[in-house]
Amino acid sequence: MSIFKKLFDKIKNLKQKKSNSENILLNDGVKKNSAVNFDHGLKKTNNFFVNSLNKIIYKNVIIDDEFFHKIEETLLSMDVGNYATNKIVSAIKNEVKFQNIDNPNLIKQIIIDKLFVYYIQDTIVQTNLNLKANETNVILFFGVNGVGKTTTIAKVANFLQQNNLKVCLVAGDTFRAGAVEQLDLWAKKLDIKIFKPTKPNQDPASVIYDGVKWASENKFNVVLCDTSGRLQTKTNLMNELKKINNVIKKFDPNQPCESLLVVDATIGQSGLIQAKCFSEVVKISGIVLTKIDSTSGGGIIFAIKDNFNLPLKFLCFGEKVEDIEMFDLEKFIKVMLKNFSFLEEE
């Protein structure tokens, strides 16, 4: 049995433990060239990861402390993070000792298995959006300035439309100049309804409350709420986000169904600081990683899940509205291991 088969069976067994017939299951297969997009989006991460591991394995004739130190350096360079890296390397060491392996070329499967099983651990990797049938589902997007939040919302909206859901947008970013116009432009391109502020400098919480109410009255399946980019150090803006979350719950205690933090993948471990600060204000349900094609640090997914147990919901790359993928661990594994010389193809 190949490593792919073993890992995928573990993943599928975990997924099968969680099934809710009330949830809307999204299908990434509605998109064309999904596998190609994953390859493109994670190319830098794949190249760095595979090339680094191959060099370590082929340049070391024995398994010693230096060998494990080089693996540790590779994981840290991928933004896996100190804690996760130490745990993963320790697990690799223990397995190598247990199997009494002394040939570096024989531990490739162990390295990969421990890396990705660590991501799964004993938890269920719930990457599907928590959307309920016959309800107006509210998804709140937030993050710091410049992460590509508004474009991400357009990408998610397009993806949901491809899943035959009735989607609308709420322009809650009343602070940034041109933000409402930018979202409105996307709405027109995608032929999606949008709720905009009714007066200049309107309180964003009131815009979102009115927008969610309007979406519910018009029987939309999903309403995507844009918010102003905010630095986690600005107390007043963070309190504003808390207020926005509260007014949504005032309309419906079960909403928002998803509160998604949008993070720029190129900032590496700084994303952990952002996640920590935002999680103190709003209960984050998942992460959207943008600009994943511009970095070799795809290992940040391990650090985020390790520190906050937050699932990755979407990967974004490029400027096109189609440049988005639901996070799929099976696809992620295949791309991360592409061209790893010993692996047999399924």
Regions found by a protein language model. Name each.
Residues M1-N128, K132-L140, N158, Q162, ...:
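Non-catalytic terminal/linker segments enriched in charged/polar, low-complexity residues
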Residues F116, V125-E346:
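P-loop/Walker A NTP-binding module and the surrounding RecA-like catalytic core of P-loop NTPases
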